[in-house]
Amino acid sequence: MIPMNKYQTELTEELMNTLPQEVQEQLLETLTTVEFVKRLISPNRPYARDLPRDEKGRIIVDITNPHIIEDADYFRQPALHFLKYGCYTFLKPNSNPNSEFRRHWDEEKRRCYEGYVRESDGEWVTGFNYWFMNYCPMMVNKLIEGRKKAIRTEAFPFFFEGIYWRFHYLWQAREGGKHAIELAKRGCAKSYSLAAIMSHNLILGESEESNRRVITVLTAYQKEYLKDDKDGTLSKFKPSINFSFANTPFPHLMLKNSPNEMSWQMGYKDEYGVEKGSLNQVLAVSAKDDSEKLR
């Protein structure tokens, strides 16, 4: 049989005999001819510790030849703390820049911008991925012991390597000044990933250098793929920002919050009516047959 790394299901003769002949042939053809699949199952698939690092100590991620990811919960500690205790920290609110509370949240914001690196092996997640995993609850299916059916409940995202690849792909495209495109099946958190990027850019901005007057535009051919009342992407975006407003000290004052117009803007007006704050915006536009709407 085909040699594989220890994380794959062993392809035994017994297992193969449970499959129809046609499926056996298709499976073997895929495992032996599709280069990406061959790299995923290879006994020589690298670990993070085997990869070269950049000047910041981060591994150089090759999404065409993915490495094996270990101990992914290392990057989900805020989410795991919230799931266990119902809060992100036991530190008491304190606006003093030198307080533990302020330092804690300044570090969290830095990770949401720059990503988070594990020094021991250089493994890292991008800032958007860190925000997605720790500050963007989503509806997940959970199996309960003793019950046959799963329950649908709100929780934080699990770590999936496909989503890890997605965010690294987007980061590499952005850093390289290029566009990005993804073709994907249903049910792989595309809308939740987009919603996370939108809420990140609205509340924090894109980066430490670009955190004011950032405009993020979500577009789709038909409006129903956007709207929050038809399971569109906005139905994932709105709970995300509301959760952040309720549970973090990140900015929460809004100049505009209009689901009907599909438009949101951070900021506030002072006593003189002057608009203050980041003024970051999120807009959703249905292009339909008129691409000029996106101008």
Pin down the residues of each PLM region.
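Phosphate/NTP-binding elements of NTP-utilizing enzymes
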Residues: M1-R295
